Amino acid sequence: MKTYLQLLEHILQQGVEKSDRTGTGTLSVFGYQMRFDLTKGFPLVTTKKLHTRSIVHELLWFLRGDTNISYLKENGVTIWDEWADNNGDLGPVYGKQWRSWPTADGHTIDQLSDVVQQIKSNPDSRRLIVSAWNVGELDKMALMPCHALFQFYVANNKLSCQLYQRSADVFLGVPFNIASYSLLTHMVAQQCNLDVAEFIWTGGDCHLYLNHLEQAQIQLTREPLPLPSLTIKRKPASLFDYAYEDFEFVNYQSHPAIKAPIAV
């Protein structure tokens, strides 16, 4: 995962100081891309320990179309707690847009089901896109989508995915996002009887919060360890029938966790 460390270093060296919505302040660069060959290991950051339970359960929660944190809480995941209201609701965030995008005529579109069917029936399509950036509902969301849009691409019977992340909390959020969308790519590939190829991460405003700079510098002193591999233990009936127990990150080694405050 030297690719990720290079982004940390780039921001520390080239970033400009900017104000932000949270009032914390950031070092920021605009426009950056990282590519991960999914055939050479699963891209879990190894220079600090990641909570893989949170990564998997959050993705399963998205895939359920859920926007209430009760499922996450039941499974020991707290990463959305800061934004939920007293009832645990977040408004029409990722899961709603992925699975039930509202149309003007009162219907809804299940973007994920549609894109899986498109991959199976027309893998050369240039329209294999899922978007969470619903302009008409942004003001109802507890947090507007940071990872806003992703696109699949099939070549030589292999599936790739590219994510556009308009706002990237590089120390806390991006390692989760890389792992989450890489996992999704593996799952979609399995459902479509394809092999995996690449996950490509493209960031817009890529930033380190000013209270994360020391942690980023600590991480840069650490040597990356070999990447784990991913085992999916069964092929369920659909993309929406996976369970936490279906996934195993084999030989995940990491340096110790590095604590950092979340910017709300």
UniProtKB/Swiss-Prot annotation:
Gene3D superfamilies xref list: Thymidylate synthase/dCMP hydroxymethylase domain
Protein name: Thymidylate synthase
Uppermost EC category: transferase
Gene assigned in the entry: thyA
Organism whose genome encodes this protein: Legionella pneumophila (strain Corby)
Record CDD domains: TS_Pyrimidine_HMase
Family statement: Belongs to the thymidylate synthase family. Bacterial-type ThyA subfamily.
One GO BP annotation of this record: methylation
InterPro entries found in the cross-reference section: Thymidate_synth/dCMP_Mease (IPR045097), Thymidate_synth/dCMP_Mease_dom (IPR023451), Thymidate_synth/dCMP_Mease_sf (IPR036926), Thymidylate_synthase (IPR000398), Thymidylate_synthase_AS (IPR020940)
Residues noted as binding (6R)-5,10-methylene-5,6,7,8-tetrahydrofolate in the record, renumbered to the chain: H51, D169, A263
Lineage of the organism: Bacteria, Pseudomonadati, Pseudomonadota, Gammaproteobacteria, Legionellales
Catalytic activity: dUMP + (6R)-5,10-methylene-5,6,7,8-tetrahydrofolate = 7,8-dihydrofolate + dTMP
Highest taxon of the lineage: Bacteria
Quaternary context: Homodimer.
